[in-house]
Amino acid sequence: GKTTILRRWRQDKALKNAPVIVHDLSEFGLDAELLADEDSPPTPGCLKNRVAALHGCHAREKLHESVANVLQEISKLDPEPDLVLCESTGAALPWPLICALTQDKRFYIRHFIVTVDALNLHRDFADGDVLTGATSCSEDIALRRASEVLAEQILFASVIIITKIDTIPDSAVNAQAKALQKLQPNATIALSAHAGVLLPQLDATLAPKLNVLKSRAEQFGLTNESATARSVDSLVIRDPRPFHPERLYE
């Protein structure tokens, strides 16, 4: 998934010291913990050792204010970073996040990247046909809401990375790429297995223009949304034993 890709990118010498903003739906900031140094856990709402953990209220009602504070802290770093990485929750609505990240004119969006899990898209959304309307959506309320959020994220994407492509047939991967390109014709489509896409491979992709993104948000009536999808709950299960899906099911 996206956290695995981000951890892979940070192994690159050029990105090792890049600050990371982690926008997390949960109350615990697990992704920020994964990206932070083991001996320096993140502090909610603050930049600590170049990792900013924005979860809980910092991911929702205080997002704009918290991002402003973090960007100010980043601007004081020495040496000054060339770029800032931001990982957001899968339940994030894109326009409020874009507004928060671009409020400080010293920063601009180089890429707006959406990751799509190939196996989930294959299993739950008919390889993207549900998103395009070619196939009717499931009656499952959760899947219907997930498809709406994903389609909205893709609407603003400059890059779409289809992850875990090794879990489905090549024909399904091709169908997914076509469906996603139909939703967002201007986006670069990248295919990834085992976090195989590197950030420099996206250099040829142009940066999205903020005025175009704003027009898109206005066109679809998305300018007054909250930062995360409504009616979405998160649950964290802690267990010292190694993860096994059968035990999770039980």
Language-model-detected regions and their locations in the chain:
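Nucleotide-state-sensitive switch-loop elements of NTP-binding domains
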Residues: T3-E148
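C-terminal accessory "lid"/substrate-recognition subdomains
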Residues: T135-E250
